[in-house]
């Protein structure tokens, strides 16, 4: 696998996921996603597709005009008949709803300010594409006020809290009995990963995407692949260098699963560690 293999594989996986999601939407949705591809990330298109799936499912299940229609049979002419009040009712619905396509005991979905704003933005983008291509002449979403997102206080760790977090990762004192059984096998990895993120401010997604040869000890920097394929070097200090050196000595002795040989941080399954696993790791300590 090459230097860009992780990000490239994510895009490939997202392409297949997007195709699957588009297959559940009306045929003209394919034109929209093809149109926005040059200026959006694959993850953004996936998010928009999920949002549109929720919207069309809502119309089918809750709007009497569309009750007799399958989702794929809803036309652009149908969408042009909607009014701002229909969109406002949809936003109210999004605050708490159940997904009819996913039966189960824990099936209630909720959206607060940020989630409502994103879903309205997805729908607005969808309508505007067809307005620009003169397939429709009326966009009810533009007449709906975007939900206001109230700023939240940013939680930052002070120096003592950072030191305590790293101490706990090294000692494992606060872990459950079950977690402590795995601690010796993951301690160097966890300390290196946390020290790197705290010491450089890189994102979790950037951290899990690192390969071994992205680390440059000669210049004390790591090569990061950011959105749009942009490559940057982020420099680190002595504490990060020490933690990485200790971990990499152990990492070199680990034979990774085929296809994950170049990954810097591995899971216990000897595969590239996932974003979700890192989030659980941080929560654990």
What is each stretch, according to the model?
Residues 1-285:
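Conserved catalytic core of the tyrosine transesterase superfamily
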